[in-house]
Structures are given as C-alpha cells and as structure tokens.
C-alpha cells in the first residue's frame, strides 16, 4: 500500500488526519485521474455513512471534484456497495464513498471505485498519491462552463433498494431482527426486508452522527442476540457502519460468522450448479472447521491474502463468484463487485426459506474450532523475519507435529504495526491455549520488545 491509501482507501481521524483540505485534494486529483479517458463530461457518484464528519468531508471532496469539471451526483447516506452498484448500472466514471466502515465515529475514510464498480487498482492509487505529493498543483483550472455541476440524487437509494429486493425471495412467515449499526443500512434495511414481506424488529436505527458502531452492529452483536431471543426471530442480521459486511445470529441467539455464512450460501449454490468452478475464495484467517466442512462437501477453496480487496482480486483473476472473510465481508460476484451486507443477508434468508431449514441447522454443518490470537510487540525490523529465527521455526514445527492435522497454527506480521500475530485453532480451548502460549513465549524470548 502507498503513503495515503491503505487496503480500504484513505483513513484517519476526521479533521485531524483526514482533513477537509485533504478531502478537497482527493476529490480534485482523484477526479482528474479517473476521468482521463472520458470523451464526455465525467460523472461521479458520492455517498457517505452517518458520521458527524461525513458532511464536512463530503462538501470538501465534492468541491475538489467540481474544480476539475466533474458532474457530481450526490447520493447522501448510502451503503458502500450501493455506490459500487450504481457506478456500474448508471455508467458513471467513478464513485466515492466516505466512511470508516466498522471504526468508531471519530474516524472517517474516503475510498474510490472505478467505472467497473471495483476498488481502484494500485497503479491508479499511486497516480493520485503522486499528485498529492507534487510540489505544485498544475492541473487545469476550468472556469464558467468548464466547471463541474452538482446534482442531488436521492433516487440512487431507491434504485439500490429495488435491486436488493430483486435478488431475494418472499419471506412471508419469517421474522427477522435487524441491527443497522446506526450507520448506512439504517436508511435501507427496514424497507428492503418489509418489501420482502418479512416481519421485522430493528435496533441501531437512530444515527446521531456519534453513535455509529457504538455498542451495535457486526462488531458488537450482543444486543442483537438478545433481540432475537426476546422476539423469537428466525434470524438476526447485523451490519457494520457502511453495510459492506454481515454477521448473523441464529434463532437460539448464537453467532453465525462470515465463514459459516459463506459455507451456507456456497453449498446452496454448489448443489444448484451455480458455484463457479465449485470454489469459494477465502483467506488464511478462515477457521479450520470451515475448511473441513468444504472438504466434506466436495467444494474447492482458493486462499487469498487477508483483506477483502485481495479476495476480490483472486475472484476476478480466476473467475470465481463467491468469496469472503470470517469478519463478514462476503462477495457474491453474480450480483455485486464488493462485499454487500444487505445482499448477503437476503441470500442467507433465501437459503433458509427455500430449504425449510433453520439457521442453526444450516450452520451446524461447520464445526468451528476454538481459536486464539495473541499480538506480540516485536522490533519492526524483525516482524517479517520471525521464521528465520531457529527457535521460533522449531517450536512452530513441534506444535504442528503434536497437532497431527487436527489443528492449525498461523504466525504472521501485522501490516501496519510492529506486531507479530500468533494464532492457533484446536479441538478444545485448553489445547488452543497451550499451542498459542507455548509459541508466544518463545517469540517474546527471541524477538519481543519487552526483553
């Protein structure tokens, strides 16, 4: 990743790191780069989630886009995948989403989509970064009729909702509990599930600019678990702040994570002959139980680096149509080009309705192994070379021998901090504690910063 762009756009504390000045420049330089091959006036969609800083950054970003002659369609509050969908179907030059996803309200972010609805390629991001770092802004400064125009486009939300409904099935007789995280899904999820004829109960639907992801949503599903039990709902659905991920809750109040959601949808598609190459794309963080369930079902798997952009890259390069992460990013390429929490929720409910099975029955086919992750602070120069240390390599090999295939160890560096992540999965909590703690002790002794 570059100096400004991470794996999911530009992020930082709003008005401190991600300032209006930077947002203006991102609009100006990003709009210029993405419109270079347009023969007509470029059209760009802009949306945001419900953070208090969203309107400030939106105004600055739009000013930058207008300054290079872009026709801006202002969508207001909308889910990230809604931007991706509209860019493709309305033939726009690009889309921009202002959100920090599952992060707290003080953070925000800006991410771009190309005219194909996919996140920008690395070379495009680097081109924008080069303009940001240039000593002088030498881009054209049109005036009068050369300036961009601004169009309020609330119809975008309705079009996205209509699209979501067309992917589903009649949910009459089903009760669905929704947690919209006081975020972008708060403007759409209720209407979508009512249009599908579900009975609904909703929490996290009163955003005030400061409460996005605060004790609600996919990273805090506890309130949803209680709501499911209180209402007797058939399933619960928790989205994050920009609604690009989903965590589900079964009718007993148990969490159903991204691994299980992918398995349920993947098995359904596979049995109908609709799973491309009979393969699901996942990452090294997916649970061993998920891998074993796929093997038992005869479904292939392709492993991508951690991060939904890398899952998408693997899907695009090899022609797969289903992939995702344990965290709840699920990409169903037949419908959209990025993770879409509401779309995934609708497909999950569709499988339940068409199979006549409860979510707990469907999820039971994946036995989730206990998992433990420990972060160890190490010298930054050593985090990528840990496996070169004989004592560390030897203890990992010893633990893997003891597992005899009934467990998994993953040791990897953090992409952003001087940390080494030690993760293990095993059939029992006691065993997983033993494996992780044994390896972590050796890592701390050999390269830990606290020595």
From Swiss-Prot:
The active site is at 101 (phosphoserine intermediate). Binds 1 Mg(2+) ion per subunit. One of its GO terms (molecular function) is magnesium ion binding. Mg(2+) binds at residues 101, 240, 242, 244. One of its GO terms (biological process) is carbohydrate metabolic process. PANTHER family: PHOSPHOGLUCOMUTASE (ALPHA-D-GLUCOSE-1,6-BISPHOSPHATE-DEPENDENT), PHOSPHOHEXOSE MUTASE. This is Phosphoglucosamine mutase. It comes from Streptococcus pyogenes serotype M18 (strain MGAS8232).
């Amino acid at each position: 990743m570059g100096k400004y762009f991470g794996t999911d756009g530009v992020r930082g504390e709003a008005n401190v790191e991600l300032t209006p000045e930077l947002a203006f420049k991102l609009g100006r330089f990003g709009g210029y780069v993405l419109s270079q091959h347009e023969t007509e006036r470029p059209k760009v969609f802009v949306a945001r989630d419900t953070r208090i800083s969203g309107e400030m950054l939106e105004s600055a970003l739009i000013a930058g886009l207008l300054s290079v002659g872009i026709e801006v369609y202002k969508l207001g509050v909308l889910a990230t995948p809604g931007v991706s969908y509209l860019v493709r179907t309305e033939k726009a030059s690009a889309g921009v989403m202002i959100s920090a996803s599952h992060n707290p309200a003080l953070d925000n972010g800006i991410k771009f989509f190309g005219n194909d609805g996919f996140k920008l390629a690395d070379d495009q991001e680097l081109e924008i970064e080069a303009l940001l770092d240039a000593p002088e802004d030498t881009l054209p400064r049109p005036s009068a009729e050369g300036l961009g125009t601004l169009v309020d486009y609330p119809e975008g939300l309705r079009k996205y909702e209509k699209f979501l409904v067309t992917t589903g099935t009649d949910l009459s007789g089903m009760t669905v509990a929704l947690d919209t995280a006081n975020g972008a899904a708060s403007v759409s999820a209720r209407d979508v599930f009512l249009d599908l004829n579900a009975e609904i109960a909703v929490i996290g639907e009163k955003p005030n600019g400061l409460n996005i992801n605060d004790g609600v949503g996919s990273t805090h599903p506890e309130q949803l678990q209680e709501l499911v039990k209180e209402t007797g709902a058939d399933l619960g659905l928790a989205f994050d702040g920009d609604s690009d991920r989903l965590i589900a809750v079964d009718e007993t109040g148990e969490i159903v994570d991204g691994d299980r959601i992918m398995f349920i949808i993947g098995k359904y598609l596979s049995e109908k002959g609709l799973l491309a190459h009979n393969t699901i794309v996942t990452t090294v963080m997916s649970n061993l139980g998920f891998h074993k369930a796929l093997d038992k079902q005869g479904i292939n798997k392709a492993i991508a680096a951690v991060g939904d952009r890398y899952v998408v890259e693997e899907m695009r390069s090899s022609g797969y149509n289903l992939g995702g992460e344990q965290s709840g990013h699920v990409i169903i390429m037949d419908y959209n080009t990025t993770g879409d929490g509401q779309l995934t929720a609708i497909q999950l409910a569709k499988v339940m309705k068409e199979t006549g099975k409860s979510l707990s029955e469907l999820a039971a086919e994946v036995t989730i192994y206990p998992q433990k992750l420990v972060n160890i602070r190490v010298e930054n120069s050593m985090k990528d070379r840990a496996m070169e240390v004989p004592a560390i390599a030897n203890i990992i090999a010893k633990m893997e021998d003891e597992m005899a295939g009934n467990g998994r160890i993953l040791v990897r560096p953090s992409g952003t901090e001087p940390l080494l992540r030690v993760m293990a999965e095993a059939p029992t909590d006691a065993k997983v504690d033993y494996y992780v703690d044994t390896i972590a002790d050796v890592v701390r002794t050999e390269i830990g910063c606290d020595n």
